[in-house]
Amino acid sequence: MKGRVRIRGIYATALTSIFSSLSYEIVQQSVEIAERFMREVNNLPADITIKDFEYDRGKIIVMGNGTIEEDLHDVFKYSFHWKSPIKLYSVIEADESCTYGNFKVEPCLEEGIVIKPPYDGKIVLSETKAVSKYAMVWRGKGVTTFSEHINNEGERLRLLTLSSPLNRKGYNVKWRSNAKYATLNELKEDLERLVLRYENREFRDQGEDFYLITLSLPDKLHLDEVRKSIVNTVKYHHMLKLSYNREVDSLEKDKEGSPVKLLEALISDFMKIEHIKADGKAIYLRGGKVIEKEVNNDGYRITLRREINGNGVLDGIGKRIENGDYDIVEYNSDKWYQIHRYYSGIDNSLKGIYINISTPPELLKGKIRYLDLEIDIAIRDSEIIVLDEDELNKKSIYMHSSLVNKAKEVANYLIDCIQQNKLI
């Protein structure tokens, strides 16, 4: 076995199937997951945790120690992968300007443990602690606290028998959720190691790897197919779950259930546009009014009219923006690109075409989301201009080679279509 993995959240059924097949031992399953796979709940400590990102369930976080990175890239071939350059629970020292590396540090402690990696550009610290997968130990008021997942009174009393002697010596102990699944002897030895590490300031090897994966629509559809092999699952299950949790559960009680009504309900008169960059950061583009839509069991197509105001020039096209200019753009669940046609607000003449290459767009309530693949194409006065290919190569550190190759393949396909006057 490669390691023990705990999986939580809306992707749990599909990911349990996938990581089991990759020779990981699945532990601490929910009763529902255990029953779906006709297994007993495996009450053992986890080395790695995979779960929904609490701020956006379109992303997952993976944390712990083990050789899972390559498998993550292979499982999520068409998604963005961010690995924290600073380990979770590692001990760092901030400089005088309250930064560490290129990241801002809050609060500005001289030394502390990382309790939030810098996925948003900021490291959050707490006072220095010795940390293992079972517990945290540090000098303080001599109290014991528990993970929110340790809520059984008997279990808390069991753990207190070990931490109380340390409390009397002035150590704080926080029990992590894994502690429930370890023996008293394992926990006693672990606390002894943590005290030694804390007193000797031996934090060099402390910390857990942290990954944030922004899931694409193609990878969500793959998870749909995996889940479908285990339990009734409609197409777009994992996408729809982001907006309609209970409604999807209700729909799937009917084996002939169709996602069409839920897909239609996601489309409002005006749609926002969430354009996600390779490092996982979202840019909100000017949204647009829906002027045409088509939804069926196989997918969806939405055409927007976006009003373009302000000064400056059209990116890639190079023509000046004038009052009343507008963009007509189609988002199609089957296509890895969107064609923006920019028109003059004065005489409705075509100013130019800009093609954004991305993963196929997904729908959330009133919003279109896709992963931007950096490389784009502009058509200016019959000239074909390939934009930002160097950015694709630079940002490939966040992508599986399959996604990089797909972006280049789509760009070449579009160039051929333009040259043959077959651009639709």
From Swiss-Prot:
- Which controlled-vocabulary keywords does the entry list? Endonuclease, Hydrolase, Nuclease, RNA-binding, rRNA processing
Enzyme Commission numbers on file: 3.1.26.-
Q: Which SUPFAM superfamilies match?
A: FomD-like
Which GO-annotated molecular functions does the record name?
mRNA 3'-UTR AU-rich region binding; RNA endonuclease activity, producing 5'-phosphomonoesters
**Listed GO biological process terms:** rRNA processing
The record's section on InterPro entries has: DUF402, FomD-like_sf, Ntdp-like, RNA-bd_FAU-1
Q: What does this protein do?
A: Probable RNase involved in rRNA stability through maturation and/or degradation of precursor rRNAs. Binds to RNA in loop regions with AU-rich sequences.
Per the record, the similarity remark reads:
Belongs to the FAU-1 family.
Task: Kindly provide the name given to this protein in its UniProt entry.
Answer: Probable ribonuclease FAU-1
Upper classification of the source organism reads: Archaea, Thermoproteota, Thermoprotei, Sulfolobales, Sulfolobaceae
